[in-house]
Amino acid sequence: DGRVLTRDKVLKGSKKGDAVIILPITKEKNTVLVIQARPNVKEGVSVELPAGYVEDNETKEEAARRELKEETGSVTNQLILLGEFYQDQGISSAYNSSFLALDCQKKYSQMLDKDEFIRYYECKFEEALELLEKGYIKDLQSQYTLEKAKTLVKKGTLIQYK
């Protein structure tokens, strides 16, 4: 009808702001969460999954492997795409990809950016789900990734964790 829309657009990370979220599962069938300083949240810290931006020169799979290594010191030979979603399509074109990383092995020390304060925490998958259900995991991208993995486990289409 000829109307012009004006919208704000938030730019984060790389030019597009695309990000990856990784649910690491170790060879012992544990998962790895990160506890990260988050000054913008009420609690000041957040329990979440390893995550980060896709750099301009890499694929989402390469970004997932890099972030896993940087935040936890772990590597994986098997990445499974769990799903993709827009982070906040009202203000951003950022497109996030959630991965399951199987048979993770800790081989390195963390390689954090100078503005990152992250500790990792290894626990049973069921404990991670309990933290989610009790409201300790509050970021939507970690919630989404854990719920997608939980659905696959219930359907029997994913490795058994017990």
Where are these regions (language model features)?
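Short connector loops/turns at beta-strand edges and beta->alpha or beta->beta junctions
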Residues: 37-40, 104
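A conserved beta-turn-beta hairpin within the catalytic core of GNAT-like acetyltransferases
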Residues: 41-47
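Unchanged
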Residues: 18-21, 26, 52-140, 159-161
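Charged phosphate-binding loop/patch that engages nucleotide di/tri-phosphates or the phosphate backbone
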Residues: 143-162
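A short acidic/small-residue loop/turn micro-motif
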Residues: 12-13, 39-41
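Beta-strand scaffold of nucleotide-dependent catalytic cores
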Residues: 21, 32-36
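Acidic, metal-coordinating catalytic segment for phosphate/diphosphate chemistry
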Residues: 1-23, 27
